[in-house]
Amino acid sequence: MLIKAQMVPMPVTAGEKFREAVYFFNRMTETRTNVYLFPFHFSAFLSALRSVTFYLQAQFRGNKVFETWYSKKQEQMRGDPLFRMLKEMRDEALHARPIQLQFLHGPTIPEEGIETTHLEIGATTDGMGEVRTSIKVGTDGEEKEVPPLVHWVVDLPDEINILEACDSGLRRIQALLKGWNELCKEAG
């Protein structure tokens, strides 16, 4: 026997949507060495980050102080190359096709460095999507698996580091929310 139940919708604020974007950014960081999972978390991050401003507008619709303040902020965001890029990538991922991500990868080199006349580097992706790297130092050395370094990029005019761009976008949205909260406190 099954009993039907319905969840009571909880009001979702812009702050909660921001925490959702942070959640997916953290998942991106945790899965940056996984070619299957990272793109999913990136797509979810883009949607969550974009929804923060939608929720902010819905939350304060009809508030004249907010509407005056936000119209100026909206113009600033439209003129911001980073926000435009993130919005365009979100629109592409949501409405057209997956974003054409690329990744740069290589082995982690020990802090003390490596001095050799022969170095072999191996790289592969395992069945679970994890990037694996190995190094062999010297012709007679043993091949050892080492942690991979992975940087996700999009090939625009310049290679843009995805994690750095998303981190900057998060910080700018956080500053926007903080600015509105401070204005609310001043207004009483």
Question: Would you name each region that the model predicts?
Answer:
Residues 58:
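Glycine-rich, acidic and aromatic/proline-enriched surface loops and short helix-turn segments
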Residues 51-55:
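Catalytic phosphate/metal-binding cores of nucleic-acid and nucleotide-processing enzymes, i.e., regions
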